[in-house]
Design a protein with these regions (language model features):
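Short, structured segments at the rim of ligand-binding sites
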Residues: 1-259
Length: 259
């Protein structure tokens, strides 16, 4: 099973927080991952890919750029995830809205509202978010009006280096988000979960680390369904079965034998 694209994108964005090298393993070979790696390169990161392109070593320069151009951002909604780490680490960012002027800020309004509560000031101009903060972001309590995966991820990443404690309420709790927090915690962040509440105690910096991205649960579930329909035998490797627990229960109900 391939690594999860939806877990890889926020983890790659979060590498912008690091002064020290980071190694991310089990990346899927899909276009959005290449786009995110190219976006990191454009910001100043040095990317060293393994021969199979599933492992990336990321080394950030001391003076990183903070401009995420429309040319790179337009093809991938997940590129808005660089806004949180850029404003948290470098206190400024010029990030294109996904889709530019045509779509506007509505798809990312929960991101902007949450980051504003952490201390980001911004204006929208010509399809770009022009953002800055006076020094470090400051921990606060944020209650998301609706559950948003991207806004939860951006807020967690940004709050990891903020001053003091941040409490995020009504968070999305998909396994990919838990994978992001596992990665950050492995690097020294202080993030705890209680249901849909995420508590983050800001730290000054993150440590050099290696991390393997979780398996793609959509791909795993698809293979399981296909094997059940075909009445065939299938062995799945590189998978924590807990991430497709619901699918396994349903397949067992229709007669699949899974162990």
């Amino acid at each position: 099973i391939s690594g999860s694209k939806n877990a890889s994108l926020p983890i790659l964005a979060a590498t912008l927080l690091f002064d020290k090298p980071v190694v991310i393993k089990n990346l899927p070979r899909v276009r959005d991952i290449n786009t995110m790696l190219n976006l990191l390169k454009s910001l100043g990161s040095k990317i060293i890919l393994s021969r199979d392109k599933k492992t990336a070593k990321i080394i950030n320069k001391k003076n990183m750029k903070t401009y995420a151009s429309y040319a790179l951002v337009k093809t991938m909604r997940g590129s808005i995830l660089v806004l949180g780490p850029l404003i948290s680490k470098y206190h400024k960012s010029k990030t294109s809205l996904p889709g530019g002027c045509l779509i506007g800020a509505r798809p990312v309004n929960y991101h902007l509202t949450a980051l504003k509560k952490l201390g980001m000031k911004f204006e929208l101009k010509d399809g770009y978010i022009l953002a800055k903060s006076k020094g470090k972001l400051t921990g606060t309590t944020i209650n998301f009006p609706k559950i948003s995966v991207g806004a939860t991820e951006n807020s967690i990443i940004a709050a990891s280096l903020a001053k003091g404690k941040t409490v995020l309420k009504n968070c999305a709790i998909e396994p990919e988000i838990k994978d992001l927090t596992n990665f950050l915690n492995k690097a020294g962040a202080k993030i705890k979960w209680t249901g849909r509440v995420c508590k983050i105690e800001g730290v000054n910096s993150l440590n050099e680390t290696e991390y393997s991205v979780m398996a793609d649960r959509i791909e795993a579930g698809t293979f399981c369904v296909a094997a059940t329909l075909a009445k065939g035998n299938l062995q799945i490797k590189n998978l924590n079965p807990n991430i497709i627990g619901t699918e396994i229960k349903l397949l067992k109900k229709v007669g699949a034998k899974i162990k």
